[in-house]
Regions:
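Phosphate-binding glycine-rich loop
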Residues: 90-137, 151-155, 161-163, 228
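N-terminal "arm"/small-domain region of PLP-dependent enzymes with the aminotransferase-like
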Residues: 52-91, 95, 411
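PLP-dependent aminotransferase class I/II
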Residues: 98-102, 110-114, 174, 178, ...
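Residue-level detector of anion-binding/catalytic polar loops
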Residues: 21, 28, 158, 212, ...
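Conserved active-site segment immediately N-terminal to the catalytic lysine
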Residues: 215-249, 278-284, 333
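Hydrophobic helical membrane-anchoring modules
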Residues: 1-59
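PLP-dependent aminotransferase-like
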Residues: 128-217, 224
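Active-site PLP attachment segment
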Residues: 232-274, 295
């Protein structure tokens, strides 16, 4: 345990369980699980039932099974660790969380980490610690989930949107600098769809104008910028563990930082502003939040972390298959490839349709054929509450708006079957050509 850890765990409760297995112990994270997930076993059994379809023998699953947009990879290891937590009698703010924080910090190359209830919670606390308040302006991406703006709106700050680069889908640094005013206090950079932002340029801009830079890496665990993992570059960053993310705990997030003071304050804020040290359990030194995580979630996350390398590998393989399958379809633009400075961590697989293609018709066709899809993702500034509260409208960020009007998410998850990807490509090809 690192020097200075911690004190928000109740000193009165719970004996720490044995250390969860790590990479290199019983099973290497790059290996597939010893037992297939229960869901997979059920599908495999169903696939053995044969029916006659159009004069040929096809499985029930092949003919009718719906393909979801996402599906977490859960196997026996997650069950095993969760049961250990349940049997320990210590379910929240216990040793499993501390263990996870140590391992995730080591994984991303940051000295400190603090687990929280969601990625949004982590971003909110960093905005709170930045001292943001009414009248302050914060620059962020219009092409992201609403949490990228809600995190500072909760502190009373005003959203300012910088348009995106049409290739990376991240904020264009030139647009960020052009958006700065005397009231600008911070930048929330989003690593969209797992593709790293231009961190060096954004850090230079932030330093030149004395701004706080916060990295929303909620979609980008495992991504690398200039050869180093996101989280290791000195900027406070947040990762998230919703079920569609690279790894999941059901819910949850983690703040990673190079500042012990930031870590300590997040640990206090997440637990109603409690102080640290012996006898301090009911000693509250600041107004805080209930952004606590549970040891049950930490156990799931630890099991996921053991196989994260394999998760990232399988998702990269699936993305490469899609790129090959979709390359010959006219009117479909696949995601940007990696380059020397940017290594994506595959979160979702989102294609962009040509302007002349009717997206609604394509989506209807995919869904009719059992392929889940979604508009991914609408611009934040065009959400109803943004229009009503701030008066935003079309034309504010034309690049982001043009992209958001044409994007389409396809089924994508760690264990997606190659045959299912072929099916998605065939259905999409037919839908686009119709």
């Amino acid at each position: 345990m690192r020097d200075g850890r911690r004190g928000d765990a109740d000193p009165r409760g719970g004996r720490p369980p044995g250390r969860p297995a790590r990479a290199g112990d019983a099973r290497d994270p790059g290996e597939l699980p010893r037992h297939r997930p229960r869901q997979e076993r059920s599908l495999a059994a169903l696939a053995r039932v044969r029916v006659r379809v159009a004069g040929t023998s096809r499985s029930v699953t092949e003919a009718t099974r719906e393909l979801p947009l996402s599906r977490p990879w859960i196997d026996d290891r997650e069950e095993e660790l969760v049961l250990e937590v349940l049997r320990s009698g210590r379910l929240s703010l216990g040793p499993w969380i501390e263990r996870f924080e140590e391992e995730i910090a080591e994984r991303v190359g940051a000295p400190f980490a603090a687990a929280v209830s969601s990625g949004t919670a982590g971003l909110h606390m960093l905005c709170h610690l930045a001292g943001l308040g009414p009248g302050d302006e914060v620059i962020t991406s219009p092409l992201s989930f609403v949490a990228s703006a809600n995190c500072f709106i909760l502190e009373g700050a005003l959203p300012v949107f910088a348009d995106v680069d049409p290739s990376t889908l991240n904020m264009d640094p030139a647009a960020v600098e052009a958006a700065i005013t005397p009231r600008t206090k911070a930048i929330v950079a989003v690593d969209m769809f797992g593709y790293p932002s231009e961190l060096d340029e954004l850090r230079t801009i932030a330093a030149r104008h004395d701004l706080t830079l916060i990295e929303d890496s909620c979609e980008a665990l495992g991504a690398r910028y200039k050869g180093r993992p996101l989280g290791s570059h000195g900027t406070d960053a947040v990762f998230a563990f919703y079920p569609n993310k690279q790894m999941t705990a059901g819910e949850g997030g983690v703040v990673v930082t190079h500042s012990k003071d930031v870590r300590d304050q997040v640990v206090s804020l997440r637990n109603q502003g409690r102080s640290y040290g012996e006898g301090s359990w009911f000693n509250h030194v600041r107004v805080g939040f209930n952004y606590r995580w549970t040891d049950v979630q930490a156990a799931i996350a630890l099991a996921q972390l053991e196989k994260l390398d394999r998760i990232l590998e399988l998702r990269a393989d699936a993305a490469a298959r899609y790129a090959q399958l979709l390359d010959s379809i006219d009117g479909i633009e696949t995601p940007r490839s990696d380059d020397a400075d940017h290594q994506r961590s595959w979160f979702v697989y989102v294609v962009t349709l040509a302007a002349e293609i009717d997206r609604a018709r394509v989506m209807e066709s995919l869904r009719r054929d059992g392929v889940a899809t979604a508009e991914y993702i609408p611009c934040i500034h065009l959400q109803p509450y943004m229009r009503e509260q701030y008066g935003f409208g079309e034309g504010l960020c034309p690049v982001a708006e043009g992209i958001a009007a044409r994007t389409l998410a396809l089924p994508f998850y760690t264990q997606i079957d190659a045959d299912d990807q072929v099916r998605v490509a065939e259905v999409l090809r037919a839908a686009v050509a119709a």
